[in-house]
Amino acid sequence: MNTSPGTVGSDPVILATAGYDHTVRFWQAHSGICTRTVQHQDSQVNALEVTPDRSMIAAAGYQHIRMYDLNSNNPNPIISYDGVNKNIASVGFHEDGRWMYTGGEDCTARIWDLRSRNLQCQRIFQVNAPINCVCLHPNQAELIVGDQSGAIHIWDLKTDHNEQLIPEPEVSITSAHIDPDASYMAAVNSTGNCYVWNLTGGIGDEVTQLIPKTKIPAHTRYALQCRFSPDSTLLATCSADQTCKIWRTSNFSLMTELSIKSGNPGESSRGWMWGCAFSGDSQYIVTASSDNLARLWCVETGEIKREYGGHQKAVVCLAFNDSVLG
């Protein structure tokens, strides 16, 4: 892989943050130093994801997708696409980088061919409500789509069939995730509840079956994201209640609560905890919040190890990749 020394792509750890100040910032994770800032002029950034080969980062915003080069300091996007209506809320990649998926407020999830330099939309999955989240099953053959009507759709990419679940009617699904072992699926919603299912099937031609496992009253306010750890032992949930909570998947008990609440009774709210990402060894987690900061926490102790300051407005999304390619 051709990475120039001193570029983001040459660093074994890629940490990027973005949000409402129209910039994407790249950080040296261990020092907290901002190493590169990309101006993302057209809109806020709703979602960020690094390509599997660590060569590019996708930034999804209002009516567009921009992809920036990680192996050079080129300030301009190397791939741009503007043909989607409304906000794009979610973005991710097939594990070998052949295609990208997105979901957004135009009520569609889309698959994009990445093998040519101009993004080609290959397939569209239409639902009846704006889409908040899309995640890919580890089998790379099913997309989980969560929408604002409270539905979770399982779109089988091989057969084009889809199944639908509605844990709470008319309560918006804000995030869904499947753990790397494909043992569990979690989804959080706008009332703060987290639902967990056991997964079976999903191998070969078998369709994934979801068996309800538990409902966690995770937060008292809007939940914004849920993420399993790479070792599948933990589940993190982020919320408008200023916390990120970490749950053990062995029994879904609370292990650690990470809070940005002020100890000062007179101080107003520091805002929402928008998103999170675990480190590859599952020992650390980075959070993004609307007090303009990202933070690196020790999962076990809940201690803040580093703060990443520089954004002028809320940080609502991040990408964290510390897996070194062999």
UniProtKB/Swiss-Prot annotation:
Impact after mutating S55A: Does not affect ubiquitination by the SCF(FBXW7) complex
Transmembrane segments: none
Main location (coarse class): membrane
Residue(s) of cross-link: Glycyl lysine isopeptide (Lys-Gly) (interchain with G-Cter in SUMO1): K313
Cross-link Glycyl lysine isopeptide (Lys-Gly) (interchain with G-Cter in SUMO3), where in sequence: K86, K215, K245, K261, K305
Subcellular location: Lysosome membrane; Cytoplasm
Modification(s) after translation: Phosphorylation at Thr-51 by CDK1 promotes ubiquitination by the SCF(FBXW7) complex, followed by degradation. Ubiquitination by the SCF(FBXW7) and SCF(FBXW11) complexes following phosphorylation at Thr-51 by CDK1, leads to its degradation by the proteasome. Ubiquitination at Lys-305 and Lys-313 by TRAF2 via 'Lys-63'-linked polyubiquitin chains inhibits formation of the mTORC2 complex, while promoting formation of the mTORC1 complex: ubiquitination disrupts the interaction between MLST8 and MAPKAP1/SIN1 to favor mTORC1 assembly. Deubiquitination at Lys-305 and Lys-313 by OTUD7B promotes MLST8 interaction with MAPKAP1/SIN1, facilitating mTORC2 assembly.
InterPro entries: G-protein_beta_WD-40_rep, MLST8, Quinoprotein_ADH-like_sf, WD40/YVTN_repeat-like_dom_sf, WD40_repeat_CS, WD40_rpt
Effect of G192D: Abolishes interaction with MTOR
Positions of crosslink type Glycyl lysine isopeptide (Lys-Gly) (interchain with G-Cter in ubiquitin): K305, K313
WD repeats: 1-37, 40-80, 83-122, 126-165, 168-207, 218-257, 268-309
Sites bearing N-acetylmethionine, chain numbering: M1
Impact after mutating F320S: Impairs interaction with MTOR
Tissue specificity remark: Broadly expressed, with highest levels in skeletal muscle, heart and kidney.
GO MF entry, a single one: protein-macromolecule adaptor activity
Gene Ontology, cellular component aspect: cytoplasm; cytosol; lysosomal membrane; nucleoplasm; serine/threonine protein kinase complex; TORC1 complex; TORC2 complex
Modified residues (Phosphothreonine): T51
Sorted UniProt keywords: Acetylation, Cytoplasm, Isopeptide bond, Lysosome, Membrane, Phosphoprotein, Repeat, Ubl conjugation, WD repeat
GO annotation terms (biological process): cellular response to hypoxia; cellular response to nutrient levels; cellular response to osmotic stress; cytoskeleton organization; DNA damage response; negative regulation of apoptotic process; negative regulation of autophagy; positive regulation of actin filament polymerization
Oligomer status and interactors: Part of the mechanistic target of rapamycin complex 1 (mTORC1) which contains MTOR, MLST8 and RPTOR. mTORC1 associates with AKT1S1/PRAS40, which inhibits its activity. mTORC1 binds to and is inhibited by FKBP12-rapamycin. Within mTORC1, interacts directly with MTOR and RPTOR. Component of the mechanistic target of rapamycin complex 2 (mTORC2), consisting in two heterotretramers composed of MTOR, MLST8, RICTOR and MAPKAP1/SIN1. Contrary to mTORC1, mTORC2 does not bind to and is not sensitive to FKBP12-rapamycin. mTORC1 and mTORC2 associate with DEPTOR, which regulates their activity.
The family this protein is said to belong to: Belongs to the WD repeat LST8 family.
The protein's role, per its UniProt record: Subunit of both mTORC1 and mTORC2, which regulates cell growth and survival in response to nutrient and hormonal signals. mTORC1 is activated in response to growth factors or amino acids. In response to nutrients, mTORC1 is recruited to the lysosome membrane and promotes protein, lipid and nucleotide synthesis by phosphorylating several substrates, such as ribosomal protein S6 kinase (RPS6KB1 and RPS6KB2) and EIF4EBP1 (4E-BP1).
Protein name: Target of rapamycin complex subunit LST8
Organism: Homo sapiens (Human)
